[in-house]
Amino acid sequence: MKTLLLTLLVVTIVCLDLGYTLECHNQQSSETPTTTGCSGGETNCYKKSWRDHRGYRIERGCGCPSVKKGIEINCCTTDRCNN
């Protein structure tokens, strides 16, 4: 009986994937690609892009922030989906 309960507990933990952390790219513009683990149960990655006096700019990270007019943002929900 104990073995069955232990097996059910392990299966539950594996199925629920307790402790899962979303991983997002966090490099800016044309920097070497890097990733970060998102904190606080964050469920989105974002890629924000705009043009300024320095040229075309890109920012990546965790979350899905609000942006001003003229800034394009793409939000997604899977690991490293914001490249």
UniProtKB/Swiss-Prot annotation:
Record carries keyword S-adenosyl-L-methionine: no
Protein name as catalogued: Alpha-neurotoxin NTX-1
Record function comment: Binds to muscle nicotinic acetylcholine receptor (nAChR) and inhibit acetylcholine from binding to the receptor, thereby impairing neuromuscular transmission.
InterPro entries found in the cross-reference section: Snake_3FTx, Snake_toxin-like_sf, Snake_toxin_con_site, Toxin_cobra-type
Disulfide bonds: C24-C45, C38-C62, C64-C75, C76-C81
Signal peptide: 1-21
Signal as UniProt keyword: yes
Entry's Gene Ontology cellular component terms: extracellular region
GO molecular function terms noted in the UniProt entry: acetylcholine receptor inhibitor activity; ion channel regulator activity; toxin activity
Tissue note: Expressed by the venom gland.
Protein family membership: Belongs to the three-finger toxin family. Short-chain subfamily. Type I alpha-neurotoxin sub-subfamily.
Pfam families assigned to the protein according to its UniProt record, in alphabetical order: Toxin_cobra-type
